[in-house]
């Protein structure tokens, strides 16, 4: 019982430092839980959002083969393979059959539904193209389409079915052909009767595979689809193909199951080809779902270059703060430890007391922190999966770290001899150990940074072609921060002594006394100084990584998409251009984009109106803007162009050089002159050529070649997403609109950047907790000094100012040094981290180091205000104590 009372008394006497321990544990548990759980949940949500955003063929995979003479056996064979190779938990598939366009019999009467005389000449000849129909058998169509009028074919009466083939026609085809319910259509060997009209619920849905015919009802001279029961496809005079279309179950996708799916897709085609009864006529795999999943998982792999950084930063700051607080606590108890040891206290007893203190204050703080972290995620990021196991593990780890570090500091102090030599009291052994540790960390940082710069990122390629996080390179940013902070900390005593000598020559107690205290009590101030340096350095590094990634991602997305909105795949480009021009607040520019040959290289030519390019494609990199000016100012005797760096290297062509552009065997060759070299040409990918479209037309005409037509549209818009939505609804000319957001990595990387900010802010919070503990320890250990100074005539207010000056000088110096350390670490690693986070960026595009200023200034400003408040409270306590009457032994 006496032992327990003594332990409680010891804890109460150092309650300020133990409160700091509890605060650090709370920060570690809360911020650590938020980082890990948010990163895990965001990875799943980001993957699902990315795959769900894929439209048409990009969100599905399809296997096609000619319909066999035994379709039932073929269907069973296909189902057996797909059920075996595709996991039902994450993928679903449907079978359908579609005919090639079927010609309508020439004798069809207009009263039967189709007016064949609309294009007839007076002499009876017909100058209109022949109308063809596409027949579709799809048992699951009712799940993704709606009836406009009538019934589905399988609901038609038996009498109707015996005479004609009942069909439901796409409403767009019905409008174009003038069809209504009850009309009949004569084919070569059968008659169709319209029993219903339908429209897709969402023509962009992956299950429709992006077919223009489904979107509009007509494409490439064919109308439809005309939905029929599958037996109606027997004996058609055209080819009929069977399709198995697979789409992912979005809510079941995880990063691991998504990676497994790509392997499942690769195995399915060979398994189908080898399956008896499937047929042998042209099995093919179509669709972009594997590429979509690969792009999404590549983005998640890229995020792995950043996700360890906030945890490492938080852990380093937390461990440093707890270690320094343990040292501070052991140093403050040095006298009582010597006394207890002299009276027979065992080392394990002293260690057990301090470990128990750490557990007693740390466990409630860890539970509270983990709960706060989970609650914050539920409020700020609802709908994401959460894991209580993560919260429990982080809370337990935080308490364990606190217990181990405080127990280690107590063990180190208790193991010191009771009777100590001058060398023991001087701390030379401790300083030597600290110097050795600093050297070891510096060596580790140098090796890690070398590995990091060698690979260009923390990610490395594995033998199977995937990516993995290099365990040494990923430590580089934090090890650089630690090494520089430890080096700065090792130098601060010498700087403090120098400043003390300078200040001692000046009259007055301030600033001589504060600087002398900093020099003489350097180990005690090290707890707050080191964690403050690390926290400030971490926030500067975070701002550099965040700003550099944002700029690099924006540049890469602009180069990938070109315009703010890019319209591609139009079967009728004129209709797409007309629809785009009718939208409000848009600038539309047609773009020629085609493959050409430049010397030995295959390149992509992008030709558009350069005078409008800044309007349709704002935010392009500066070198592209400069290239536009160079092209416009160049001599027009030869076609002026800009080429990218890779093409320049491959052809040994630079500004002013003459090159030949081979447009194709039918379009001839034109001569051009290089006006500028850019890192990458917008919309071209690698090996790009940029030219003005009007000048290209003039050069082609002069060469006697065929003028190239525009392949796509670039649109500048006040609201790009509204333009994309309009194209999704109308699908003019079968076109697909893509915004820059589709090429951005923000949906996957932004949560990791948020986690990085959380880690840096957590490091600052740990530093603030260490400062509060330092202020409390100084207040309890230097009461006698306050009385002595008062007896010597030092006013209470001056003593308060001296204490404020001590803390302000220590923390202010740490902030300045931390900012410098963060700048050095950012210079060494931020650009590589930004590149690693944008895996699809052109290799020639160099990331620039840019600071995200507003969060940086807000975080540093809040930290400076908080530290100033702590210093003011500590100074106020000294002022009150120095001005209180009475003797110390009475108080």
Task: List where the protein language model places each region.
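Membrane transport/envelope proteins' first extracytoplasmic loop
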Residues: 1-318, 328, 456-474, 487, ...
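N-terminal Sec/SRP start-transfer signal
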Residues: 1-32, 423-441, 490-538, 783, ...
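Interfacial "coupling" helices/loops that link adjacent transmembrane helices in transporter permeases
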Residues: 14, 320-359, 422-424, 769-812
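Alpha-helical transmembrane segments of multi-pass membrane proteins
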Residues: 16, 348, 352-365, 369, ...
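Alpha-helical transmembrane segments
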Residues: 312-319, 384-405, 469-486
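Hydrophobic alpha-helical transmembrane segments that constitute the membrane-spanning cores
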Residues: 313, 357-381, 762-772, 809-830, ...
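C-terminal membrane-exit region of the final transmembrane helix in multipass inner-membrane proteins
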Residues: 369, 377, 381-382, 392-434, ...
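Juxtamembrane segments of multi-pass membrane proteins
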Residues: 456-646
């Amino acid at each position: 019982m006496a032992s327990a009372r003594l332990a409680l008394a010891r804890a109460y006497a150092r309650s300020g430092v133990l409160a700091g321990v509890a605060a650090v544990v709370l920060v570690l548990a809360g911020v650590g839980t938020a980082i890990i759980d948010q990163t895990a949940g965001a990875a799943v949500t980001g993957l699902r959002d990315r795959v769900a955003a894929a439209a048409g063929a990009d969100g599905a995979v399809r296997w096609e083969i000619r319909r066999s003479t035994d379709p039932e056996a073929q269907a069973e064979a296909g189902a057996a393979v797909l059920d075996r190779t595709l996991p039902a938990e994450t993928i679903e598939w449907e079978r359908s059959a579609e005919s090639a366009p079927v010609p309508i019999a020439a004798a069809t009467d207009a009263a039967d539904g189709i007016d064949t005389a609309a294009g007839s000449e007076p002499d009876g000849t017909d100058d209109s193209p022949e109308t063809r129909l596409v027949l579709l058998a799809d048992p699951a169509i009712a799940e993704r389409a709606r009836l406009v009028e009538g019934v589905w074919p399988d609901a038609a009466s038996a009498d109707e079915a015996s005479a004609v083939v009942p069909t439901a026609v796409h409403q767009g085809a019905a409008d174009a052909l003038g069809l209504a319910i009850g009309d009949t259509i004569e084919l070569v060997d059968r008659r169709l009767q319209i029993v219903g009209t339908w429209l897709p619920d969402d023509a962009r849905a992956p299950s429709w595979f992006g077919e223009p015919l489904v979107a509009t009802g007509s494409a490439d001279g064919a109308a439809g689809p005309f939905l029929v029961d599958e037996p109606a496809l027997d004996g058609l005079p055209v080819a009929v193909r069977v399709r198995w279309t697979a789409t992912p179950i979005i809510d079941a996708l995880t990063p691991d199951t998504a990676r497994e799916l790509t392997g499942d897709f690769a195995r399915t085609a060979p398994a189908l080809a080898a399956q008896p009864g499937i047929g042998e006529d042209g099995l093919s795999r179509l669709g972009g779902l594997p590429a979509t999943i690969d792009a999404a998982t590549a983005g998640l792999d890229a995020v792995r270059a950043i996700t360890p950084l906030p945890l490492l930063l938080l852990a380093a700051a937390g461990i440093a703060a707890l270690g320094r607080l343990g040292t501070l606590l052991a140093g403050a108890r040095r006298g009582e430890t010597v006394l207890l040891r002299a009276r027979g206290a065992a080392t394990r007893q002293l260690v057990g007391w301090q470990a128990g203190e750490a557990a007693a204050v740390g466990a409630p703080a860890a539970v509270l922190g983990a709960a706060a972290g989970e609650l914050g995620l539920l409020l700020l990021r609802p709908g994401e999966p959460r894991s209580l196991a993560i919260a429990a593990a982080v809370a337990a780890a935080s308490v364990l770290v606190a217990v181990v570090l405080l127990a280690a500091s107590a063990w180190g102090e208790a193991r010191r001899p009771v009777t100590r030599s001058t060398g023991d009291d001087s701390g030379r052994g401790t300083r030597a150990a600290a110097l050795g540790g600093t050297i070891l960390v510096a060596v580790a940082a140098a090796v890690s940074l070398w590995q990091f710069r060698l690979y260009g990122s923390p990610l490395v390629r594995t033998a199977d072609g995937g990516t993995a996080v290099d365990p040494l390179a990923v430590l580089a940013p934090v090890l650089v921060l630690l090494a520089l902070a430890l080096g700065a900390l090792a130098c601060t005593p010498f700087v403090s002594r120098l400043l003390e000598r300078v200040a001692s020559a000046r009259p007055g107690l301030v600033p001589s006394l504060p600087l002398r205290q900093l020099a003489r009590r350097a180990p005690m101030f090290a707890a707050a100084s080191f964690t403050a340096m690390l926290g400030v350095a971490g926030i500067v590094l975070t701002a550099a990584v965040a700003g550099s990634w944002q700029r690099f991602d924006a540049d890469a997305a602009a180069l990938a998409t070109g315009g703010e909105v890019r319209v591609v795949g139009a079967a009728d480009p004129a209709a797409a251009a007309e629809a785009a021009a009718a939208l409000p607040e848009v600038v539309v520019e047609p773009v020629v984009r085609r493959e050409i040959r430049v010397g030995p290289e295959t390149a992509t030519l992008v030709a558009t109106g350069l005078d409008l390019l800044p309007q349709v494609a704002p935010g392009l990199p500066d070198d592209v803007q400069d290239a536009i000016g160079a092209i416009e100012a160049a001599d027009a005797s030869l076609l002026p162009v800009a080429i990218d760096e890779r093409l320049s290297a491959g052809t040994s062509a630079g500004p002013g050089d003459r090159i030949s552009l081979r447009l194709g065997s039918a379009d001839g060759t034109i001569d051009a002159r290089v006006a500028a070299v850019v890192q990458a040409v917008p919309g071209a990918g690698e090996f790009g050529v940029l030219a003005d479209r009007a000048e290209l037309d003039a050069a082609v005409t002069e060469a006697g070649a065929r003028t190239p037509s525009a392949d796509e549209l670039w649109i500048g818009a006040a609201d790009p997403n509204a333009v994309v939505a309009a194209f999704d609804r109308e699908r003019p000319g079968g076109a697909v609109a893509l915004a820059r957001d589709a090429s951005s990595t923000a949906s996957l990387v932004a949560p990791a950047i948020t986690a990085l900010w959380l880690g840096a802010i957590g490091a600052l919070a740990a530093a603030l907790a260490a400062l509060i503990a330092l202020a409390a320890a100084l207040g309890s250990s230097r009461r006698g000094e306050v009385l002595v100074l008062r007896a010597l005539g030092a006013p209470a207010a001056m003593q308060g100012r001296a204490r404020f000056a001590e803390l302000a000088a220590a923390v202010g110096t740490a902030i300045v040094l931390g900012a410098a350390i963060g700048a050095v670490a950012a210079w060494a690693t931020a650009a590589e981290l930004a590149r690693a986070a944008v895996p699809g960026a052109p290799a020639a595009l160099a990331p620039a180091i840019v600071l995200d200023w507003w969060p940086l200034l807000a975080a540093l400003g809040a930290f400076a205000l908080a530290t100033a408040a702590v210093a003011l409270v500590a100074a106020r306590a000294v002022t009150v104590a120095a001005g209180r009457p009475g003797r110390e032994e009475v108080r």
